[in-house]
UniProtKB/Swiss-Prot annotation:
GO molecular function: 6-phosphofructokinase activity; ATP binding; fructose binding; identical protein binding; kinase binding; metal ion binding; phosphofructokinase activity
Name of the molecule in the record: ATP-dependent 6-phosphofructokinase, muscle type
Residues binding beta-D-fructose 2,6-bisphosphate, per UniProt: 471, 528-532, 566, 573-575, 629, 655, 661-664, 735
Keyword Nucleotide-binding: yes
Function field: Catalyzes the phosphorylation of D-fructose 6-phosphate to fructose 1,6-bisphosphate by ATP, the first committing step of glycolysis.
UniProt source species: Mus musculus
Pfam families: PFK (PF00365)
Residues covered by region (N-terminal catalytic PFK domain 1): 2-390
Chain positions recorded as Mg(2+) binding sites: 119
Family: Belongs to the phosphofructokinase type A (PFKA) family. ATP-dependent PFK group I subfamily. Eukaryotic two domain clade 'E' sub-subfamily.
Expression sites (tissue/organ): Isoform 1 is expressed in skeletal muscle (at protein level). Isoform 2 and isoform 3 are testis-specific and are detected in quiescent sperm (at protein level). They are first detected in the cytoplasm of round spermatids and subsequently in the flagellum of elongated spermatids extending into the seminiferous tubule lumen (at protein level). Isoform 2 is expressed at higher level than isoform 3 in testis.
Species classification: Eukaryota, Metazoa, Chordata, Craniata, Vertebrata
Entries under HAMAP family matching the protein: Phosphofructokinase_I_E
Length: 780
């Protein structure tokens, strides 16, 4: 990349103006997106305007369209809803309203519009764009604008960001607000679970989603619900019978509660609505269970945005500004989407079309097609839900094959959800499943027992590791481990854990030369708060830790805002891996995040202090600095604290906080529960296939590299990679992968904290096409 290109980003917006508006229903994380659009816009040299109250503000103009400053978006990252207001607008649907809106934009020289809202809002924006030249002609004819103004504003660029808690927009894996809505729902389900267990009750929970069952579906996976009703997939005609049988079977197996999740738009095969009251009456009448209905309503839109939504909003906001400023009269209006963990640009109308196709397919009762059109992520969730909730657990003892499940390393939230799904999918496939306590140590000592269906009941929402986990590696106990593999007839091993699980896997591979017993398939599921396992972009537990850090930073920032002129230095966990410090820095709006992967010197520390001195002269009189625990052996948290205290004398005072082990605890977030459940199911499916493949002469013999894998999320898919192949990609001394995707997000953190840096624009998303993406072809 040339030096000139490097500097291009800083001057990309000179002479241009961007307006940002939020429209339709509010969603948590919209503020993060607005903040990013404003700050990155200003960084590129553009002028940025807030449009208050959505399209209504665009039509009314005047005070509703105000120029934004760097400081005007301060302290809004952690607020729910939308600070600039949103409104449903009838005027904008009429051409007359759009004419007034065009007039307001032209008069201010605004030719770039960033719309944050649902599919209705984005369709409105596209209509506005397609009529733009006609609207300008009319305004010129009426003498409202001059020919010169019309030429200056000859075309309108539009970029959409999807903000909707329902996740009902096709083309993006997640919309802004969905993850936070899931947080609210799961908090409530966890609270209801305790009261339901006390009274042996059945609860029917109604969640939002008139045309989309995403929230209901993911909630049911995240809390192990007995049944879910979603509009995309109505139940069979005899569902009443099936539901009641399922509820009574669960009770017979010793469960004290039943949970049924209903999307507000749930229907049966004939398109007749299924309401929560209908379900309650059915259960009471047929089974006589004490049943309660809870309608969650607008609680789901409220509260603080989750770390995921803040990062998503920020990334999307940056990408939106780049898309607007790079736009030409020929580029179609696009929407910035998320695919796996990649930001992509898709043509707005293609996405809107597919979204409409889903509704059409549902209206025409083509339900299988509706699920396919919803995309890969939705289909995966549906398949796993069907397996875990609707397949009857086998009654017979002694299965096809014997698979053992264990936890290795430090505890991470979501480990139990992974164990539960692994055990249950294993049982469904007819295997005998064993659980190993205390990691490789327990495997050597024979702390192994058989797990039945109800052994893992209610595990999804529990933090920590119920099996017990140790950091001990297998190398020194290979003999005892081999003996126990034979003794318990273990034919496959699922290892859920952190970097030790991965190195343990490598040691088992090495040990195969010495011990034939180790020639069994094994799979490592990455689970660690540090997110430092090679072969996966995410590991189970990191999202929960991130949210814990975020909540703490919010409270600390609040304290600093009250005291004024105070800088907090916060130490996060993660070993040598800077994932938590970087992502929490992005989500909490930190001024700097020190990490091992990006070496820093005393000069860098000095620059940061000078930066904070400048900041104290503005209206924002507080600072937040994150430091990864092992980022530098000499520049410790105490050293940085002392340096800041000395250099900031008379200007600001400093405080330090070491967050410590609270980052490993807590109830798992919806993301970690869902991710763990899917990973467990995927791993067990792979395992069953591998065992069959390795069956020779009456026994299992697996000695090929692909019989020992790490299951990881890579960009857009879950993939199995042999541990031996990942060896070259690993820095063993510092226990981190050599290449890490999230390092590309570091510049965003710095720009949003007002550092004058070069932004490499070569890595920005390119326009792709939604239909091609579906069929799995490469991006255009």
């Amino acid at each position: 990349m040339t030096h000139e290109e490097h500097h291009a980003a800083k001057t990309l917006g000179i002479g241009k103006a961007i307006a940002v508006l939020t429209s339709g229903g509010d969603a948590q994380g919209m503020n993060a997106a607005v903040r990013a659009v404003v700050r990155v816009g200003i960084f590129t040299g553009a002028r940025v305007f807030f449009v208050h109250e959505g399209y209504q503000g665009l039509v009314d103009g005047g005070e509703h369209i105000r120029e934004a400053t760097w400081e005007s978006v301060s302290m809004m990252l952690q607020l729910g809803g939308t600070v600039i207001g949103s409104a449903r607008c009838k005027d904008f649907r009429e051409r007359e309203g759009r004419l007034r809106a065009a007039h307001n934009l032209v008069k201010r020289g605004i030719t770039n519009l960033c719309v944050i809202g649902g599919d209705g809002s984005l369709t409105g924006a596209d209509t506005f764009r397609s009529e733009w030249s006609d609207l300008l002609n009319d305004l010129q004819k009426d003498g409202k604008i001059t020919a010169e103004e019309a030429t200056k504003s000859s075309y309108l660029n539009i970029v959409g960001l999807v903000g909707s808690i329902d996740n009902d927009f096709c083309g993006t894996d997640m919309t802004i607000g969905t993850d936070s809505a899931l947080h609210r729902i799961v908090e409530i389900v966890d609270a209801i679970t305790t009261t339901a267990q006390s009274h042996q009750r059945t609860f029917v929970l109604e969640v939002m989603g008139r045309h989309c069952g995403y929230l209901a579906l993911v909630t049911s996976l995240s809390c192990g619900a007995d049944w879910v009703f979603i509009p995309e997939c109505p139940p069979d005609d005899d569902w009443e019978e099936h539901l009641c049988r399922r509820l009574s079977e669960t009770r017979t197996r010793g469960s004290r509660l039943n949970i049924i999740i209903v999307a507000e738009g749930a229907i049966d095969k004939n398109g007749k609505p299924i309401t929560s009251e209908d379900i309650k009456n059915l259960v009471v009448k047929r089974l006589g269970y004490d049943t309660r209905v809870t309608v969650l309503g607008h609680v789901q839109r409220g509260g603080t945005p989750s770390a995921f939504d803040r990062i998503l909003g920020s990334r999307m906001g940056v990408e939106a500004v780049m898309a607007l400023l790079e736009g030409t009269p020929d580029t179609p209006a696009c929407v910035v989407s998320l695919s796996g963990n990649q930001a992509v640009r898709l043509p707005l109308m293609e996405c809107v079309q597919v979204t409409k196709d889903v509704t059409k397919a549902m209206d025409e009762k083509r339900f299988d097609e509706a699920i396919k059109l919803r995309g890969r992520s939705f289909m995966n969730n549906w398949e796993v839900y069907k397996l875990l909730a609707h397949v009857r657990p086998p009654v017979s003892k002694g299965g096809l094959h014997t698979v053992a499940v264990m936890n290795v390393g430090a505890p991470a939230a979501g480990m139990n959800a992974a164990v539960r799904s692994t055990v249950r999918i294993g049982l469904i496939q007819g295997n005998r499943v064993l659980v190993v306590h205390d990691g490789f140590e327990g495997l050597a000592k024979g702390q192994i027992e058989e797990a039945g269906w109800s052994y893992v009941g209610g595990w999804t929402g529990q933090g920590g590791s119920k099996l017990g986990t140790k950091r001990t590696l297998p190398k020194k106990n290979l003999e005892q481990i081999s003996a126990n593999i034979t003794k318990f007839n273990i034919q496959g091993l699922v290892i859920i854990g952190g970097f030790e699980a991965y190195t343990g896997g490598l040691e088992l591979m090495e040990g195969r030369k010495q011990f034939d017993e180790l020639c069994i398939p094994f799979v490592v599921i990455p689970a660690t708060v540090s997110n430092n396992v090679p072969g996966s972009d995410f590991s189970i537990g990191a999202d929960t830790a991130l949210n814990t850090i975020c909540t703490t930073c919010d409270r600390i920032k609040q304290s600093a805002a009250g005291t004024k002129r105070r800088v907090f230095i916060i130490e996060t966990m993660g070993g040598y891996c800077g994932y938590l410090a970087t992502m929490a820095g992005l989500a909490a709006g930190a001024d700097a995040a020190y990490i091992f992967e990006e070496p820093f010197t005393i000069r860098d520390l000095q620059v940061n202090v000078e930066h904070l001195v400048q900041k104290m002269k503005t209206t924002v009189k507080r600072g937040l600095v994150l430091r990864n625990e092992k980022c530098n052996e000499n520049y410790t948290t105490d050293f940085i604290f002392n340096l800041y205290s000395e250099e900031g004398k008379g200007i600001f005072d400093s405080r330090k906080n070491v967050l410590g082990h609270m980052q490993q605890g807590g109830s798992p977030t919806p993301f970690d529960r869902n991710f763990a459940t899917k990973m467990g199911a995927k791993a067990m499916n792979w395992m069953s296939g591998k065992i069959k493949e390795s069956y020779r002469n009456g026994r299992i013999f697996a000695n090929t590299p692909d019989s020992g894998c790490v299951l990881g999320m890579r960009k857009r898919a879950l993939v199995f990679q042999p541990v031996t192949e990942l060896k070259d990609q690993t820095d063993f001394e510092h226990r981190i992968p050599k290449e890490q995707w999230w390092l590309k997000l570091r510049p965003i953190l710095k720009i949003l904290a007002k550092y004058e840096i070069d932004l490499d624009t070569s890595d920005h998303a390119h326009l792709e096409h939604i239909s091609r993406k579906r069929s799995g072809e490469a991006a255009v």
